[in-house]
Amino acid sequence: MARIAGVDIPREKRIVISLTYIYGVGKTTAQKVLKEAGISEDTRTRELTEEQLNQLRDGLDKVKVEGDLRREISLNIKRLIEIGCYRGVRHRRGLPVRGQNTKNNSRTRKGPRRTVANKKK
């Protein structure tokens, strides 16, 4: 397995697909990096030379990936919480941030249902 940006990428897959195993690299970013490095998208990871791997590493150094990207996202969320804006409040309460309805759904964000016991009359 080749190791790029601290991630072991699969050897048997096409390089454009293998690069998407890196957090922050989707298909479009992978295609741009490969085009910049002059490597065909159909090349298998095992067929790459050490020089080509170094070109890929240099290309990915220009893009925020893995730890840097995760850190930036968490700092952005902390900043929103700290300034007390609406989005920050939604993050703090664990509710959907982007305006979705919460009456019936939003289970992903809220977690499993907490049943409330009924009072006997």
UniProtKB/Swiss-Prot annotation:
Q: Where is the composition biased (Basic residues)?
A: 106-121
TM region positions: none
Q: What does this protein do?
A: Located at the top of the head of the 30S subunit, it contacts several helices of the 16S rRNA. In the 70S ribosome it contacts the 23S rRNA (bridge B1a) and protein L5 of the 50S subunit (bridge B1b), connecting the 2 subunits; these bridges are implicated in subunit movement. Contacts the tRNAs in the A and P-sites.
Q: Which NCBIfam families match?
A: uS13_bact (TIGR03631)
> What lineage is this protein's organism placed in?
Bacteria, Bacillati, Bacillota, Bacilli, Bacillales
| Name under which the protein is recorded | Small ribosomal subunit protein uS13
* Pfam families, A to Z: Ribosomal_S13
Question: Which GO cellular component terms, listed alphabetically, does the Swiss-Prot or TrEMBL entry include?
Answer: cytosol; small ribosomal subunit
Keyword vocabulary terms for this entry: Ribonucleoprotein, Ribosomal protein, RNA-binding, rRNA-binding, tRNA-binding
Which family, according to the similarity comment? Belongs to the universal ribosomal protein uS13 family.
Does the entry feature the keyword RNA-binding, yes or no?
yes
Disordered: annotated span: 94-121
One MF term in the entry's GO annotations: rRNA binding
Its quaternary structure?
Part of the 30S ribosomal subunit. Forms a loose heterodimer with protein S19. Forms two bridges to the 50S subunit in the 70S ribosome.
An individual GO BP term = translation
Q: Which PROSITE patterns match?
A: RIBOSOMAL_S13_1, RIBOSOMAL_S13_2
